[in-house]
Regions:
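Exported/periplasmic ABC-transporter solute-binding proteins
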Residues: 1-75, 80-251
Length: 251
């Protein structure tokens, strides 16, 4: 879902005279988890997403599928807090200690005397996969959960969406947090003293920066390969930058 702006802009740049019906037929927008399942089940040809989890790679292998990952740009995995929180910087180790509950109060980090509310994302999502990598095999605390009323009357229990309380902390990819669902009441914290700016993401100084990918099966279709080649061209990389992401190289 967080990659939607870049491939939606590509459709407008590449294809002529396409209508809503054509887009509904050829472009699928869903969560990383669902679109990945569709890829390995041969329902779609190409997925735009962060690097799949180890479990997703294993799932593909179990179905006899080999994945082909082509980098198309760089993104940052960011942590955010309430804008009024005095904390502006955290170390990678402190992030791990917050999410293993070794640190439970902002006061220990130089903030106010308030219990930390560490929000997470659902398993299988791109954000949660990235978070597991940051934790380096350290066990995440159980996520905050909430009950959700479905349209048909049923109630489901799910991982809670981020709530911007004064003592909250959450995480996501930079574009998602700063553009798609921008909230002026939050602020991004620096990690190890490095802010998630475009320059720091591109040169790799920001510690939680990584490439995002166009993912196909081992032998992509001719049309998929043409789209991949276009995104790697100067025009495609310019579009990546114009939609708010970080191109692979300085343009």
């Amino acid at each position: 879902m967080a990659m939607y702006p870049v491939y939606a802009a590509a459709v407008q740049a590449i294809y002529e005279n396409v209508d809503e019906q054509w887009c509904d037929l050829h472009i699928v927008t869903d969560t990383s988890l669902k679109t990945f399942e569709q890829l390995i089940n041969d329902e779609i040809d190409l997925v735009f997403m962060a690097k799949p989890s180890d479990e997703q790679f294993a799932e593909a292998r179990a179905q006899g599928k080999t994945l082909r990952l082509t980098p198309m740009g760089r993104e940052a995995f960011v942590f955010f807090v309430n804008a009024k929180n005095p904390i502006d910087n955290l170390t990678a180790e402190q992030i791990q200690e917050i999410y293993t509950r070794k640190i439970t109060n902002w006061k220990k980090l130089g903030g106010v005397n308030s219990r930390i509310m560490p929000f997470q994302r659902p398993d299988g999502s791109g954000s949660q996969t990235a978070m597991h990598r940051i934790m380096q095999d350290k066990p995440l605390t159980k996520p905050i959960r909430e009950e959700y009323q479905q349209l048909m009357g049923g109630i489901i229990n799910r991982v809670a969406d981020y709530r911007n309380y004064p003592n909250s902390i959450g995480y996501s990819f930079r574009y998602f947090a700063t553009s798609m669902f921008y909230n002026e009441g939050i602020k991004l914290v620096s990690i190890n003293g490095v802010a998630p700016t475009v320059e720091n993401i591109q040169n790799g100084d920001y510690p939680f920066s990584a490439e995002f990918y166009m993912i196909t099966l081992e032998n992509p279709s001719k049309e998929s390969q043409q789209l991949i080649d276009w995104f790697l061209s100067p025009l495609g990389q310019q579009l990546v930058e114009q939609t708010g992401y970080v191109p692979l190289k300085t343009l």
